[in-house]
Regions:
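Bacterial N-terminal signal peptides
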Residues: 11-22
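A metal-dependent hydrolase signature that marks the N-terminal structural subdomain at the beginning
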Residues: 28-100
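Post-HExxH zinc-binding segment in Zn-dependent metallohydrolases
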Residues: 40, 151-203
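Pan-zinc metallopeptidase signature
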Residues: 42, 213-349, 357
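Acidic helix-start/capping segments at beta-turn-to-alpha-helix junctions
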Residues: 54-74, 162-169, 200-209, 213, ...
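Catalytic zinc-binding patch centered on the HExxH motif and its immediate surroundings
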Residues: 67-81, 101-125
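Short pre-active-site segment immediately N-terminal to the catalytic Zn-binding motif
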Residues: 125-142, 173
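C-terminal soluble interaction/assembly domains
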Residues: 338-438
């Protein structure tokens, strides 16, 4: 679950800003050499083949001031009820602890990592002033200037405004487009300047140990979800760039990716392969009076892969290579994804019902996920499913029952307080599948 939806405001990639920690030095005082900043902005626009920014008026903050500003931005945008529901869904699947303080975790994560950010609502381009303007700061500025260019020429504001009614998977895909674009642009900017690249290497080498304490203790769905747009998004945008130059990247803003599957497999984006819309039965009648739906969303291929990977905090990131690395089995089991949808229902107190259906590209792909998810559930609950048939399983849990079923290209998973409730909802899911297959 990409449960902190406003990460788009913080535009420097986590990997880069982890490298920023302690890596300042050399150059003139940041904020005192506007000509140097304007040069970076002009060269970035030329490289990106877009008109230069209308006016460069960056805001310079110390790290302490930036941490205060970041916290204020997060608190302003925080949807307490929506986030609470998302946490409950994520906890149901074992992705986060039920008691997690997600707001504070995000404040700490971004305070630890941010090197700068662009706020599309105010137009502020913020550069964190850690001492001097050197190669690393030029890298960050190039990234942030790209966001200004996106806002002025490519409809970034409209792209972000259109996220309100999207699933988390769709949001993560869109963020991967514009953060991948900004990341690739800043990489190419440094690569175009051999002296700057050497200075950047020297700055990083002199930076000492990287501070990743918060990242290393965060649930992987949070930490890897934060870096996915920058790392995997860069690979996606690079593929577009290699296929059709910056014109192909620009065109993606008018037809943005709609799933993390398309980010992970650029060929599927280029082929126009869209996720399947998955319908769920109305569970209210089965659950009874007083129950209400509090979360309706989509996992998507990336988050399913993270789920199946079942990583310890801090795992999954190869910071030397700048890539997300999940176990092959988890990635393979998620790779046949074709669509999914889940809902979380509550009785207003502690009782919950979770309904999740996923559709796969073939019956074989569905079975691969079914077996992988079964193994994941049995491992985390330290209990085995029971069944009379290998494709229709039951797991007794404290405070409820889980049902897992495979039918053709569809996998259904239901958790409810009673066996009758779980069975009836699963029967409705299976009936819907049979109607679709008929």
């Amino acid at each position: 679950m990409q449960i902190a939806r406003r990460w788009f405001r913080l535009a420097s990639p986590l990997l880069l800003t982890l490298l920023l920690t302690g890596a300042g030095g050399g150059g003139t005082a940041l904020g005192q050499d506007l000509a140097a900043l304007e040069e970076v902005a002009a060269e970035t626009a030329a490289l990106r083949e877009l008109p230069p920014v209308a006016a460069l008026d960056p805001v310079f903050l110390t790290r302490e001031e930036a941490e205060v500003a970041i916290e204020a931005l997060l608190r302003e945008e925080w949807d307490e009820d929506g986030i609470a529901a998302a946490i409950r869904s994520a906890a149901t699947l074992g992705l986060v602890p039920a008691e997690i303080n997600l707001l504070q975790l995000n404040i700490d994560l971004l305070g630890e990592s941010a090197g700068g950010y662009y706020d599309p609502e105010t137009g502020n381009l913020v550069v964190i002033q850690d001492g001097s303007f050197g190669a690393l700061e030029a890298y960050v500025l190039s990234h942030e200037v790209t966001h200004v260019l996106q806002a002025e020429h490519l409809g970034l504001d409209e792209l972000i405004d259109g996220m309100d009614d999207l699933t988390d998977d769709e949001i993560l895909a869109r963020v991967a487009l514009y953060e991948g674009d900004a990341s690739l642009t800043s990489i190419l900017y440094v690569a175009s300047k051999p002296v700057l690249a050497l200075q950047l290497g020297a700055q990083l080498a002199a930076g000492g140990d990287l501070e990743t304490a918060v990242f290393d203790t965060a649930p992987p769905v949070i930490s890897l979800g934060l870096v996915f747009p920058y790392l995997t998004g860069t690979t996606f945008v690079q593929s577009l760039y290699e296929d059709g130059g910056w014109a192909a990247v620009d065109a993606a803003y008018a037809s943005p990716p709609t799933s993390t599957e398309q980010i992970l497999h650029t060929d599927k984006y280029l082929a126009g392969e869209e996720p399947v819309d998955v319908a769920l039965p109305e569970a209210a009648a089965t659950l009874g009076a007083g129950w209400e739906e509090i979360d309706d969303n989509r996992m998507g291929e990336f988050q399913i892969a993270v789920l199946l990977a079942d990583l310890d905090p801090g795992a999954g990131l190869n910071d030397l290579m700048g890539t997300i690395e999940l176990p092959d089995a988890a990635s393979a089991a998620a790779a046949g994804w074709d669509g999914d949808r889940y809902q979380l229902w509550t009785d207003g107190e502690d009782a919950e019902a979770f309904v999740w259906a996923s559709v796969w590209e073939s019956d074989a792909e569905a079975e691969e996920f079914f077996l992988a998810f079964r193994a994941y559930e049995e491992a985390r609950h330290d209990a085995g499913f029971t069944s009379e048939r290998p494709d229709d399983l039951t797991l007794e849990l404290d405070g409820g029952v889980a049902r897992l079923a495979l039918a053709g290209d569809t996998v259904s998973y239901v958790r409810a307080p009673t066996a009758d409730q779980a069975n009836q909802i699963l029967d409705e899911l299976m009936s819907d599948h049979l109607e679709k297959a008929a």
